[in-house]
């Protein structure tokens, strides 16, 4: 599954790239 940086709940479901998904989410939220 690809992490959707537009959905804050979705990055939590990313098992391998949790930190990466979180960073992408934060960057898109800047």
UniProtKB/Swiss-Prot annotation:
Disulfide bonds: 3-21
Tissue specificity annotation: Expressed by the venom gland.
One biological process term in Gene Ontology: killing of cells of another organism
Keyword Transmembrane helix in record: no
Any GO MF annotation of the entry: toxin activity
GO CC, alphabetical: extracellular region; membrane; other organism cell membrane
Main localization of the protein described in the UniProt heading: secreted
Subcellular location: Secreted; Target cell membrane
Superkingdom: Eukaryota
Transmembrane helix is among the record's keywords: no
Entry keywords, A to Z: Cardiotoxin, Cytolysis, Disulfide bond, Membrane, Secreted, Target cell membrane, Target membrane, Toxin
Family the UniProt entry places it in: Belongs to the three-finger toxin family. Short-chain subfamily. Type IA cytotoxin sub-subfamily.
Subunit structure: Monomer.
Function: Analgesic toxin that is blocked by atropine and naloxone, suggesting the involvement of cholinergic and opioidergic mechanisms in its antinociceptive effect. Shows cytolytic activity by forming pore in lipid membranes.
Name listed for the protein in its UniProt record: Cytotoxin najalgesin
